[in-house]
Amino acid sequence: MCIRDRSNSALKAEKKALRTAADGLIVIAQTSEYSALAEINSETDFAAKDSKFLEFCNEVKNHLEKNKVESAEALNNDFNEKREALVQAIGENIQIRRLDLVENDGSVGTYLHSDSKLGALVSINIDNVDLAKDLAMHAAASNPSCITQDDIDKDVLEREKAIYKKQAEESGKDKNIMEKMVEGKVRRFLEEVSFVSQPFVKNPDQKIQELLDESGASIVTMSRFKVGDGIEVEKKDFASEVAEQLQ
């Protein structure tokens, strides 16, 4: 790419960088040493289906299979020029938003949904790839927040407790009954968000912990990316969207 074209690409990419990119695709790369999960964002689903965007995502995947890149920042640096050129070609903000890399100690299972907008990695401490794959599929489907109940973020737990306490107080019941109401709701909440406490998606009569116990396995790490998770999207009318695309 010549200096002038490079300058134009960089300028356009800089202008569009502040625009919300909450669509896109998930890519998964696996080697004998590690597995990687990355989210690559575009502004619209239309752009996410563009052949140039798909080619870019495939290049990122191939790069991750050949290079042990351990942060989204480093991955962005590796692809900055190509990303800027893609922004110029497609006319949308394109970002490599996040990356998670897991060492292949024990077994690592991966799951990528058919639309490539949801992916998961789960590593376990034993050599059982089929189990790891089942767990990755479960993580994608059930969206656990933590591996065990002890791993739940304390601020999240306290916020939930406060909500349940307020609900109990509004019930007007006796104090001891209200305490039991809160305890019951907290217990159910922890069971719902904890990986090992959830019913296994392939066999709802069995908890994940029971599945692990059958093989003497434990979950080491869990990572789940859904395209656009946590990104606040501003509602715009059609005319505004068209005008913005022309900038």
Q: Residue locations for each model-derived region?
A:
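N-terminal assembly/interaction segments in proteins that build large macromolecular machines
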Residues: 4-247
